[in-house]
Amino acid sequence: MQSAIKPVEYDRPLAAGAACGVGEAWAKVPAPLAAGEREALKARIKALLEREKAVLVAHYYVDAELQELADETGGCVADSLEMARFGRDHGAQTLVVAGVRFMGETAKILSPGKRVLMPDLDATCSLDLGCPVDEFSRFCDAHPDRTVVVYANTSAAVKARADWMVTSSIGLEIVANLHARGEKIIWAPDRHLGGYIQKKTGADMLMWQGSCLVHDEFKGIELDLLRNEYPDAKILVHPESPEGVVALADVVGSTTQLIDAAVKLDAQRFIVATDLGILHKMRLAAPGKTFIEAPTAGNSATCKSCAHCPWMAMNVLSNLADVLERGHNEIFVDAAIAERARVPIDRMLDFAARHKQRVQASGDLLRDQQLFANVGAA
């Protein structure tokens, strides 16, 4: 059975990056598999990983079965940068990246001598789509006095135009450091994450107006109603969410930080405002606790993604097996672009090392206290 095609709308910043229109893209909807097919594919994938001496590197947002395969075969399930670092440091010469295209590109930039494959090269990201390099370069050229800071969710070409790359777990600290040095900033592409960091640091930040189509759907009105229904629940929010959602959070953090909070916080119930793919890892990490999806439907909300990235959903058992069997869907990054893009990535890694801070949480809430910058009433 062939995959269907799903139209997807996303925020498309207009000229100069100061206003937003609507862009149109598409995502494949994979054909469902019977239970017997799934088990056969899992066994085939395990054998192919061994045959190809490959390692599976998966994001928290992909299908639970792919996350399980990564864990069972000595791979990695992590956020985008930890995926790339794992691939760089692992002995395998073939990395299979289950995620979206910018993750494969970042893995290739950090592991230029390795073969990087992806189940589907068309798996993209609304933040990446909403920040075309030509338009972004013109935006930067119009403000030459500003330091360019881009989020990991961008193409290699956009990273190559930047001074710094950040992830959601260290962006606050890097921007605070730049602000303390008196630097004015261009921030791209996520306006919600940028606004959160700007509010926390007071930095002079000129924003590109992109957004994640998953997190942008969460709305404060419905979340507040759900909180009233479950007053004992802690609210975990990714900072790509709108300001009204962040304001209701008990913890704001990256994917890794939210998982860590679910384990460490003294609560039995959590409302989670990020891609529902993360719930698999949360349930494994904190068995016995209850996780409730933050609402993406209601009077003020929509359900364009229903809290699951349509491009992450393109990573499935069938195309994972196929890419291992055929060795296609290889990621290539132009050498000149890769060389320039590695500069802002290495700056972030060097900053983290100098400040003795991992880019993801360490697992110790006391040690990571500064990462949980937005803690509301219990």
From Swiss-Prot:
GO cellular component entries: cytosol
Binding, [4Fe-4S] cluster: 125, 212, 309
Location(s), subcellular: Cytoplasm
Keyword RNA-binding: no
PANTHER family: QUINOLINATE SYNTHASE, CHLOROPLASTIC (PTHR30573:SF0), QUINOLINATE SYNTHETASE A (PTHR30573)
Protein family according to the UniProt entry: Belongs to the quinolinate synthase family. Type 1 subfamily.
Function: Catalyzes the condensation of iminoaspartate with dihydroxyacetone phosphate to form quinolinate.
UniProt name for this protein: Quinolinate synthase
Lineage, broadest ranks: Bacteria, Pseudomonadati, Pseudomonadota, Betaproteobacteria, Burkholderiales
